[in-house]
Amino acid sequence: MRRTDPEGHGPVRYGPPLPDTGLPVPPELAGHLCAAADRAAAEPVGGSPAVVEAACGYWERRGLVTDPAHVAAAPGAPALLLALTAALGGDVLVPRPCAAWWAPYARLLGRPVFHVATPAESGGVPDPYALLETVRRVRAEGGDPRLLVLSLADDPTGTVAPPELLHETVEAAAGEGLHLVSDETWRDTLYAPGGTVLLSPAEMLPGQVTVVTDLASALLPAGWPAAIARFPADGRGGGLHARVLDILTALGARVAAPVAAAAAHALTEPEPLAARAAATVALHARVAAALHHAVVSAGALARPPQAGRHLYADLGPLRTALAGHGVGDAQDLEEFLTARLGMPAPGGHRFGDDLAALRVRLATGPLLGGTDAERAECLTSPAPLELPHVHRALSTVRSVFDDLRDDAQRWEPPR
């Protein structure tokens, strides 16, 4: 990531990638990919029958009965969101903050993007009253809001929106005639799935919600791009599905055949892969809790992470200490922490937050070690936080944040 100076750049800003697992590829998945390496024929646009059928089963296990005629696959969720945005037309609404890859695709199409505030307790889903106010303001100014993108388990905040908030926001969006894209990329990474209620907007508003899931979250390695979309099961959904396929065809956006073979297998969730996925989530939950403790113990603010492989920290309380290091905004903070921590630390401006706010996303994957052997050991260890390489990485984080806390205390005026 580089400083986003205006000179030499267009209006589109590309943000950091999804937080990776930091773990080696499961041998079972690698075997399916290699077995399909000699397939010369291109996959169908929208996905092969095997991928589509597996996607239907994936959603049905999550309570969403799905018609194969309303499913599409693409090489990553960004391609699907680009096609959906182009097919639906109009202006786009997103929460603030939001995933770094949402807004650039609307801007690439020349579509205005409007950020809507989220409640203090969670990210990913806009406050319903702020949503209504934004929609009415945009329309009063001559805009045409048509699409709301939201997420239940959120990047960058790592939080899960409560069902009552989701209900109110979905009702508000429905009342304004918005189509919803529910990014459910992180739904399978909940730290406490038994204690966290997660409902899809598609269960509440079947005719106006398209679900998008990037398989890089829990099912495939980040370097094997594949994603699936579930369209509304009615005439409008069928028409939208057809338009999206047209756009994917124009883009040549097909899933590579070996990746498609691995995706079709992963979507069936065989026991070995399901167990590996559960162990991965448990590992990142433990590391995220330790990372959160290090951050808040130094005086920064961060919601306790509930999903994903990341947390979102507000270093506003340490602004005075950071100013002593030349840090005045989120870009400065990104560069400072990336250098000090030795791992990417994208600033909040990458996620649509105010540049002046000292916010940053911190990922857990880079804390798992520097080699495949070290990272694999994290999965099998009964005490991964005590492994030397993990302990060193967390100690570095604690040291950096503790130094900032100490600097802030030295700068406090006498009482």
Task: List the model feature ranges, each with a label.
Residues 39-172, 188-203, 384-386, 390-391:
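Conserved core of the PLP fold type I
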Residues 281-292, 296, 301-321:
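Conserved glycine-rich beta-strand-loop-beta hairpin in the small C-terminal domain of fold type I
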Residues 65, 336-345, 351-415:
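PLP-dependent enzyme catalytic core of the Aspartate aminotransferase-like
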Residues 1-76, 83, 269, 368-371, ...:
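N-terminal small-domain helix-loop-helix segment of the aminotransferase-like
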Residues 109, 175-176, 298:
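Helix C-cap/helix->beta junction micro-motif
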Residues 211-281, 295:
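Conserved core segment of the aminotransferase class I/II
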Residues 11-13, 212, 254, 301-306, ...:
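Short beta-strand
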Residues 121-126, 159-160, 190-196, 239, ...:
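Short, flexible/disordered intra-domain loops and linkers
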